[in-house]
A protein has these predicted regions:
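Short, low-complexity N-terminal regulatory "tails/caps" that precede and couple sensory modules
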Residues: 1-41
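Regulatory loop-to-helix N-cap segments in sensory/regulatory domains
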Residues: 2-12, 165-182
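Short regulatory/linker helices and ligand/cofactor-binding micro-motifs at input modules
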Residues: 32-33, 44-60
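Helix-loop-beta substructure at the N-terminus of cytosolic sensory domains
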Residues: 55-102
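Regulatory sensory and allosteric helical modules in signal-transduction proteins
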Residues: 98-139
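Conserved nucleotide-binding and Mg2+-coordinating catalytic segments in signaling enzymes
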Residues: 202-215
Length: 215
């Protein structure tokens, strides 16, 4: 038998032994199943994160959730938090913030934060081709893309949470965007409550005459 005949026979056997090609309907059904599975996973993870946020009643606990627990929870490599602090009020009430280093940044000028978003701040997914990658997570190596969540108070930008990943191609569907928008709104609300609680706590501990701490 010639080499050409042998090759033809091998090709025919491989084709006959190959699994059947999935139809278009089967492929669509498989993609739908995968999407539903992913959405259920994200929903469960989001519910768990919501419970962690609600349990973090103290400002320090909330920072720990945002900068340590949240990236681990969603398999991001790192998290970075920018906060608008024009009067240094946050600097006075955040205890132990230095432990987070450059991952927690207090900005007296809102310009740098506003430059990250459009006129109406919304969730942004940026990659290495975006110039904003030179502004966020600057000290991190190997980060290929970042998710940016704007933190708003009455429509005003008061913070920006950045989550870095090594994934290069990441597509957000409508359901994922809605879920992230909900989480961003919840983080903003929890942050406002935690700041207010911390400020009240410090006022209670101040002597009304000397404004010196009682403890």
């Amino acid at each position: 038998m010639s080499d050409e005949q042998n090759f033809s026979r091998i090709q025919r056997e491989e084709v006959e032994g190959a699994p059947p090609v999935a139809s278009g309907a089967a492929l669509r059904q498989r993609r739908l199943t995968e999407t539903v599975t992913l959405n259920r996973y994200l929903y469960r993870q989001s519910q768990h994160l919501e419970h962690m946020l609600l349990d973090a009643v103290e400002l320090q606990s909330l920072l720990e959730v945002l900068l340590v627990s949240l990236p681990r929870h969603f398999s991001f490599r790192v998290a970075e938090l920018w906060l608008y602090d024009p009067d240094k009020d946050l600097a006075r009430i955040i205890v132990g913030g230095e432990r987070y280093g450059h991952y927690l940044q207090l900005h007296q000028d809102a310009f740098a934060m506003q430059e990250l978003y459009g006129l109406e701040p919304d969730i942004e997914w940026i990659d290495a081709t975006d110039s904003r990658m030179f502004e966020v997570l600057k000290s991190e190596y190997g980060i290929s893309s970042a998710l940016m969540l704007p933190l708003l108070e009455s429509g005003r930008l008061v913070g920006s949470l950045h989550l870095g990943t090594e994934e290069k191609n990441f597509i957000l569907g409508d359901e994922e965007e809605d879920l992230l928008a909900h989480l961003a709104a919840m983080i903003s609300c929890c942050f406002k409550l935690a700041v207010t609680r911390q400020q009240v706590s410090q006022l209670i501990m101040l002597d009304p005459l000397t404004q010196v701490g009682n403890l």
